[in-house]
From Swiss-Prot:
Residues 551-560 have a biased composition (Basic and acidic residues). Residues 463-484 have a biased composition (Polar residues). This is Protein P1-P2. PROSITE patterns: PEPTIDASE_S39, RDRP_SSRNA_POS. InterPro entries: DNA/RNA_pol_sf, Luteovirus_Orf2, Peptidase_S1_PA, Peptidase_S39B_luteovirus, RNA-dir_pol_luteovirus, RNA-dir_pol_PSvirus.
Length: 1062
């Protein structure tokens, strides 16, 4: 390597020397005489004698004789390389300078050429445009000149007509400046109203399936008045309310104002509505609030009533008033939910009801608008009163909200308030053509003037006492801030001081906090309800909270979340997961166990019942053949083995219908249930779970809980066996609320599609379901077989989750059972209920009369009953039922569908817990859980859909009992996995219909056995005796048509129960 480097260096030096001449090395500094030459053949260097400098070239001052420079061969390589490097740098610099100079000259010449060409091209282009443009004008001028020269008279006439037309137009515009706008906008307004307003809503009508009542009753404080046309015919209604500014005002629907006259039934006076001034008016919300001329309240004989604004309206019963033959009638209604910016109301109305108010006790909730046409909505809608600070709402902050929650979400309330604020500002800026409004004029009320003068000249001492009394008045817990409540300012900017001011509503605020005003029942300001959420979190809208309040709220939230986290860890610790030895029922596997918390006992016949049977042999004959089932884990496992085996046997032979068949049945079911379209839960209206909306949903869910029901697994571990222990504890209720919210949050985020039953529980998406034998009498044949009726009890948190997701739909089905195939809401306790049900059946079946239906029911309907229906429900049936529910949700969201899908996954893939703590995971999805919140609703709809799959034109069901069209193919039920039996008589819900008013219970003997062997009134406990007597009279009511049997039972059961001294 070193040798190669040396050779390369020598070759490089040789190349430099051989190219010295060509490289320009003949520089004067190196032009020595006698320069040496190199011999390529020998490689030796030879040098001539050292050249001598000329003597005249040396400086004259130097007298010393200089020595000639040594030859190049005597110099060192370093000096030679230095010289070569310097020579190369100078030559490169010279070449670079010459190159740059030539390149610059070339670029400059090119730039001058391009610039000259560009300027010449631009000049040519511009002159071309000028020539073309000028040519066009010149041509046009020549044509016009030729036209005028050829048609002189015609052109003159056209010019004169154009001038005359222009003068006429300017004159008409000066005479009526707004006439063109009016002529242009009027048709557009008519087209807009016809195309949009009347398309979405129409006249009032009766809600299909809703049965209300009407009684003669006057409106509260005579606050409802009639609106008439100019000719005296009926138009609508208006309602008098007391504003927070101290004035009275009328509230009515905006579409009722045109040409209306406010008419008093008492005095007969009429006041044109055009004399009322609107302080709030919204065509979109169809509501107007108007204040009237002086003394209008006295002329109409009305008083201002209290009202409730949109942000505080809750679900519950209501009423409205109408005039019928000159008499006021009160009609029932139900506040159901939200519909866009309105409130959906279940009520039966008719044309001319617009503007009538809906009342909760003596509080106005809103006014009737009409009936929505979109989405086949089966309810009327109510226009609500927006919250306008100082006018319809006070400048006070309340600490708590309605017990059952609000109808509107926070976003909807804010939107209503924003629109109301803009409308008020718009009206405040309004000026009439005279630049003065009637409200700016002073009233000529002499009495009021004297009253005002007296108030002005009042002694200072008395005024000071009054002020002192007001200051020392005890403040209520609902008042956080008492801001100045200023009167409303009118268009001119002046305060209307001359108007008679009513009593300041301070006392009303105090009554509100005590539950005497505002929302009664479902609208009360319940301070005890603060446990459900943060106090003040749903407080009066539009008032900002202080930093201290925000800090307190955050502290409560942190405490609630921490408590829920601790409780979750506590409950998770009781599970011992893992496979266990021993056999298990088919379709299940043992996946773990928990400690034993339940110790059910087998019931036996009571001494009281045995004594009655000995004394009354006829009673013994009636109750023979029944007995109490066994209880405990062994009985549960035995019955589970039998029912699970039958379930899987039917499932193996069943086939799932095709996609087209399922789609057809789903669409037909949605059409049959179209009257039950409801809103999605408030908590899932956004893309993420909303805490504020959840608070409203959970309030309603908690209110509907059965307090004496069991809490289930794992909450029984805490030692409170019933719902009451959690709901009525103000410390545990916030924890329960947070636990429910956390579960919904996990359901919205988890990937649950491929999870097993135990994984769903381990991930916190659901709880195990407690399995136990129902404590009711069984037939002896079932007792001998060991096939007991099993109950699957869902936990408290899962109950609340299901109620939050489905309570709107289930409650709507109960309210409107007359217009939907599902009948969970009807009863047969009275003859009237029996006749009402048969009338519904007669209309659906097409029978000419109820009598004909009862006499020849086989021609019009077919009563069927499914054996073991809960165990026969396949998972695809639950999926189709959920699809129907989603399609019947008006404002459904992806989050709502996600939560419902998670709930369906959990309910179809459950972990059962026996009484001894054994956990059994379901390996085959399906089976309707009997203790679920949706069991009655979903079973009824699945039963109807099964009839549709079998070709029935119509069907109605109550759980597994059904009445369906005669054209139903019963053989198709086997392919669906159902075992169906056809009744010989007209039977439905364990009752046989003998005639239009007679429904005889089928299980009379079973009821008697449970009555005499389920109670022991001889114990002497007053509560036991009271419950026994209530059960006796309930059974006698069911058997009311068999008077002979009722008389005997009354003699056998009632006297003996009260003879014991206690």
């Amino acid at each position: 390597m070193n040798r190669f480097t040396a050779y390369a260096a020598l070759f490089f030096m040789f190349s430099l020397c051989s190219t010295a001449k060509e490289a320009g090395f003949l520089h004067p500094a190196f032009n020595f005489r006698g320069t040496s030459t190199m011999s390529a053949s020998s490689g030796d260097y030879s040098a001539a004698p050292t050249p001598l400098y000329k003597s005249w070239a040396l400086p004259s001052s130097l007298n010393l004789t200089t020595q000639p420079p040594p030859p190049l061969t005597d110099r060192s390589y370093y000096e030679l390389v230095q010289a070569l490097t310097s020579k190369m740098r100078l030559d490169c610099q010279t070449v670079g300078d010459m190159t740059w100079r030539h390149l610059s000259e070339m670029l400059f010449a090119s730039w001058n050429s391009v610039k000259e060409v560009s300027l010449k091209a631009a000049s040519v282009t511009l002159w071309a445009i000028i020539n073309i443009w000028f040519g066009l004008y010149w041509t046009l001028a020549r044509l016009i000149t030729l036209f005028l020269w050829t048609f002189s008279i015609e052109a003159l006439c056209l010019i004169l007509l154009g001038c005359i037309t222009s003068l006429i137009y300017k004159g008409a515009l000066s005479l009526s400046e707004h006439l063109p706008v009016f002529l242009f906008m009027s048709p557009l307004k008519i087209i807009w109203r016809a195309a949009f307003s009347k398309r979405n809503y129409k006249n009032e009508r009766a809600v299909e399936g809703y049965k209300g009542f009407s009684v003669p009753q006057k409106p509260p404080k005579s606050a409802v008045i009639e609106l008439q046309h100019e000719n005296g015919s009926h138009l609508g209604y208006a309602n008098c309310i007391r504003l927070y500014s101290g004035e009275n005002a009328l509230v009515t629907a905006e579409h009722c104002l045109e040409g209306a006259f406010a008419t008093s039934l008492k005095t007969g006076n009429r006041i044109p509505m055009s004399t009322f001034f609107p302080i709030f008016k919204s065509a979109r919300n169809d509501i107007s609030i108007l204040v009237g001329p002086p003394n209008w309240e006295g002329l109409l004989s009305v008083k201002g009533a209290h009202f409730i604004t949109a942000d505080k309206i809750g679900k519950g019963p209501a009423s409205f008033y109408t005039l019928e033959k000159g008499e006021w009638m009160c009609h029932s209604a139900t506040i159901d939910g939200a519909h866009h910016q309105f409130v959906s109301v279940l009520c039966n109305t008719g044309p001319g009801y617009s503007g009538t108010g809906f009342w909760s006790s003596k509080n106005l909730l809103g006014v009737l608008k009409g009936f929505p046409l979109e989405e086949e909505c089966n309810y009327n809608v109510m226009s609500v009163i927006p919250s306008i600070p100082g006018i319809t709402s006070p400048n006070y902050v309340f600490e708590s909200t309605a017990v059952k929650g609000r109808v509107f979400s926070d976003e909807a309330v804010k939107e209503l308030e924003r629109e109301a604020s803009e409308a008020v500002k718009k009206l405040a800026r309004f000026k009439s053509l005279t630049d003065k409004n009637w409200a700016d004029d002073y009233d000529s009320d002499e009495d009021y003037g004297l009253e005002r003068e007296a108030a002005t000249n009042a002694p200072a001492e008395k005024t000071a006492q009054t002020n002192s009394a007001e200051k020392t008045a005890p403040s209520t817990s609902a008042e956080k801030t008492a801001l100045t409540n200023k009167p409303f300012k009118w268009a001119s900017g002046t305060v209307r001081q001359n108007k008679r001011q009513l009593r300041h509503p301070r006392r009303r605020y105090k009554r509100t906090t005590n539950g005497q005003n505002g929302r009664t029942d479902h609208h009360s300001y319940g301070g005890e309800n603060q446990s459900l959420g943060d106090r003040g979190e749903d407080s009066e809208q539009g008032v900002s909270e202080s930093p201290a309040e925000a800090q307190t709220k955050e502290a409560r939230k942190a405490w609630r979340e921490e408590q829920a986290k601790q409780f979750t860890s506590y409950f998770n610790a009781i599970y011992k997961w893992g496979a266990q030895e021993g056999g298990c029922p088919p379709g299940f596997r043992k996946c773990g166990h928990i400690p034993r918390y339940y110790h059910p006992r087998t019931r036996g016949e009571t001494q009281w019942g045995q004594k009655l049977c000995q004394v009354h042999p006829e009673l013994a004959d009636k109750t023979a053949g029944f007995g109490w089932p066994k209880a405990g884990s062994e009985a549960e496992l035995q019955s589970l083995n039998l029912q699970a085996a039958r379930w899987l046997q039917r499932a193996e032979s069943a086939t799932i219908p095709g996609a087209e068949a399922r789609k057809r049945v789903i669409e037909k079911t949605v059409e049959a249930y179209r009257n039950c379209v409801t809103n999605a839960p408030l908590c899932s209206l956004k893309s993420k779970l909303d805490w504020a909306g959840f608070q409203q949903d959970i309030r309603e869910a908690v209110q509907s809980l059965e307090l004496d029901a069991g809490v289930g697994i794992p909450y029984i571990a805490y030692g409170l066996p019933a719902h009451r222990g959690w709901v009525e504890d103000h410390k545990l209720l916030p924890v329960l609320t947070q636990l429910t919210f956390d579960r919904l949050q996990k359901m919205s985020e988890a990937s649950f599609e491929d999870m097993s039953a135990e994984e769903l529980v381990q991930e916190g998406l659901c709880d195990p379901i407690r399995l136990f034998v129902k404590g009711e009498p069984h037939k002896q044949s079932k007792l001998d077989e060991g096939r007991y009726r099993l109950i699957m009890s869902v936990s408290l948190v899962d109950q609340l989750v299901a109620r939050v997701l489905f309570q709107n739909q289930n409650k709507r089905e109960i309210s409107l059972w007359r217009s939907v195939p599902s009948k969970p809401g009807f009863g047969l306790s009275t003859d009237t209920q029996t006749a009402e049900f048969l009338e519904c059946l007669q209309k659906v079946s097409g029978a000419p009369s109820v009598e004909e239906l009862c006499a020849n029911h086989k021609e019009y309907t077919r009563p069927t009953d499914c054996s073991g229906f809960d165990w026969s429900v396949a998972y695809w049936m639950l999926e189709d039922d959920m699809e129907v529910r989603n399609r019947l949700t008006f404002n459904n969201t992806q989050l709502t569908k996600r939560l419902r899908a998670a709930w369906l996954k959990c309910i179809g893939n459950s972990v059962l817990c026996l009484s001894d703590g054994t956990l059994l995971a379901q390996t085959v999805p399906g089976v309707q859980k009997s203790g679920s919140y949706n069991t009655s609703s979903s079973n009824s709809r699945i039963r109807v859909m099964a009839a549709y799959h079998c070709g029935a034109d119509w069907a109605m069901a109550m759980g597994d009992d059904a009445l369906e069209a005669p054209n139903s193919d019963l053989e198709e039920y086997k392919t669906l996995g159902f075992k169906v039996e056809v009744g010989r008589e007209l039977e439905f819900c364990s009752h046989i219909f003998r005639n239009p008013t007679l429904a005889v219970p089928v299980n009379t003997n079973k009821m008697l056995y449970k009555l005499i062997h389920g109670y022991n009134p001889e114990c002497g406990n007053p509560e036991v005796i009271q419950n026994y007597l209530a059960a006796v009279f309930s059974v006698l009511q069911e058997l009311r048509h068999d008077r002979e049997l009722v008389a005997k039972l009354h003699q056998w059961l009632v006297p003996s129960a009260t003879t014991k001294e206690h």
